[in-house]
C-alpha cells in the first residue's frame, strides 16, 4: 500500500465506531502525511496546524456549500411544508461576506464577552440546580444528567422559550446537529432517515415562526425580542434570517457545548491531580476549558469549499473542492504545541477549536462561560468522583466528539 493509499485508509477508519474512544493515533498518522486528496474525489484533507490556520484565514476558501462539486446541504432546517424558493435562507454559518458580515453584525452584540459575563450568576444557579438533584451518594450520568441539560436551558432562556418546550427543542437539536457533520453520509450507524430530518426541520421552523409572532405582539427581555428590533445603520434582520438565526443558535450552540463540558469532565476524572488543583483554585477552570478545546475538541473537523484554485502546503486545491480541516489533528501538532499529547491546562494555547478569521465562532464566549462554571461547580460540589468504567461509549458523530454516556460514582454532593 502506498503512502497516499494508507492515508485514505486511515481517514476512512475514522468512520469506524471502534476508533471513537481514541482516534488520535489515526490523526497523528494523517498529520505526518500532510495535506492529501481522497483519490480522484474533489476532497482535500488538511491535518497540520499551520495549514489549517492558513486555510481558515484564506479569502479564497468559502463556507458556501453551493459552490462545491459535492452536494452538501446549506440548510440547518428544511421546512417540507414550503417550496424550495420559500425556504428560509441559510444561516450565516453558510454565508460569506458581505452577507455574513451583515448578519453577524446584527446578531453579535448579544454575544460579546461583556454581555455574556452578565449571565454567570444565572448559569451558576442552573448548574447548582442540576447537581442538587443528586444529593445522596451513588452514580449519575455526567452527560445526560449534567452536561446535556445546561446548554439547552441556557439557550432556551436566552431565546425566551418556555420551560415546558425545552425537551422538544433538545430533541430537534440532537437530530439536526447531524447536518453539521460532512462525514455523516458515509457513516452507516450515523445516518438518519432524510424524512425524519425534514420533519424535525419543519417542526422547528414552525415553532420559531409561532414564537416570533408572539414576541412581535408582546416583546420581552429575551434575545428573540432583541433580534426582532436589532438594527445597524438602518438595517434589520428579515423574517427568514431571524428564523435561520434562531435555529443556528440552538443547533450549533447546544451539542458542541454539551461535548465540551463532557470531554473536560472526563479529562479531569482521568487526572485526579488536575481535578484537585481545580477544586483548590477555581481560577484554573479557564485553562482546563482551553486545554480541552485543544486536546479533545468537541468539533473535530471544519469543512470549507475552495471558491478558487489555491495551494495548501504543496498540494494543488481546485475550485469546488471540499477542504476538510482536521482540527483534532492540527491541535496535537508538535510544530505548534510542545508535548502535544499531554493534557496541560497551564500551556499557552493557540488552538483552532472556534475557528479563525471572519467565521470565528460567535458563541465562543458563551460556551467558555458555561463550561467554566460547570467544571468549577463540579469540582467544588461533587465529592470523590470516579469513573467506574473507562473508556466510555462515544456518540455516533465523527465530527461532534463526546461520550454518549459518562457514568460517575461519587460519595456525596456538597451543599451550595
Language model regions located:
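Cytochrome P450
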Residues: 1-416
Amino acid at each position: 500500500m502506498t503512502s497516499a493509499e494508507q492515508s485514505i485508509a486511515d481517514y476512512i477508519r475514522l468512520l469506524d465506531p471502534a476508533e471513537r474512544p481514541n482516534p488520535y493515533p489515526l490523526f497523528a498518522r494523517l498529520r505526518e502525511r500532510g495535506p492529501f486528496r481522497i483519490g480522484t474525489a474533489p476532497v482535500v484533507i488538511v491535518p497540520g496546524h499551520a495549514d489549517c490556520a492558513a486555510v481558515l484565514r484564506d479569502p479564497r476558501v468559502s463556507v458556501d456549500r453551493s459552490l462545491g462539486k459535492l452536494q452538501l446541504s446549506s440548510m440547518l432546517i428544511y421546512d417540507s411544508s414550503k417550496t424550495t424558493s420559500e425556504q428560509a435562507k441559510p444561516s450565516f454559518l453558510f454565508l460569506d461576506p458581505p452577507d455574513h458580515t451583515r448578519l453577524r453584525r446584527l446578531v453579535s452584540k448579544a454575544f460579546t464577552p461583556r454581555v455574556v459575563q452578565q449571565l454567570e450568576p444565572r448559569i451558576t444557579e442552573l448548574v447548582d440546580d442540576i447537581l442538587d438533584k443528586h444529593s445522596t451518594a451513588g452514580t449519575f450520568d455526567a452527560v445526560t444528567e449534567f452536561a446535556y441539560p445546561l446548554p439547552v436551558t441556557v439557550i432556551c432562556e436566552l431565546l425566551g422559550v418556555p420551560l415546558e418546550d425545552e425537551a422538544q427543542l433538545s430533541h430537534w437539536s440532537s437530530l439536526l446537529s447531524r447536518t453539521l457533520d460532512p462525514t455523516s453520509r458515509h457513516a452507516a450507524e450515523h445516518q438518519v432517515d432524510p424524512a425524519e430530518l425534514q420533519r424535525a426541520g419543519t417542526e422547528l421552523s414552525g415553532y420559531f415562526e409561532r414564537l416570533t409572532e408572539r414576541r412581535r405582539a408582546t416583546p420581552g427581555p429575551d434575545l428573540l425580542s432583541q433580534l426582532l428590533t436589532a438594527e445597524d445603520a438602518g438595517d434589520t434582520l428579515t423574517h427568514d434570517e431571524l428564523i435561520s438565526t434562531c435555529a443556528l443558535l440552538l443547533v450549533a450552540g447546544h451539542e458542541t457545548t454539551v461535548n465540551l463540558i463532557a470531554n473536560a469532565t472526563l479529562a479531569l476524572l482521568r487526572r485526579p491531580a488536575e481535578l484537585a488543583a481545580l477544586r483548590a483554585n477555581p481560577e484554573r477552570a479557564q485553562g482546563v476549558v482551553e486545554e480541552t478545546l485543544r486536546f479533545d475538541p468537541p468539533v473535530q473537523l471544519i469543512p470549507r469549499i475552495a471558491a478558487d484554485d489555491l495551494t495548501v502546503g504543496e498540494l494543488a486545491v481546485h475550485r469546488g473542492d471540499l477542504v476538510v480541516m482536521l482540527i483534532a489533528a492540527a491541535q496535537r501538532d508538535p510544530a505548534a504545541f510542545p508535548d502535544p499529547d499531554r493534557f496541560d491546562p497551564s500551556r499557552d494555547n493557540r488552538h483552532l477549536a472556534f475557528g479563525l478569521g471572519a467565521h470565528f465562532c460567535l458563541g465562543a464566549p458563551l460556551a467558555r462561560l458555561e463550561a467554566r462554571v460547570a467544571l468549577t461547580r463540579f469540582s467544588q460540589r461533587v465529592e470523590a468522583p470516579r469513573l467506574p468504567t473507562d473508556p466510555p461509549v462515544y456518540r455516533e458523530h465523527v465530527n461532534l466528539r463526546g461520550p454518549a454516556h459518562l457514568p460517575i460514582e461519587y460519595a456525596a454532593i456538597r451543599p451550595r
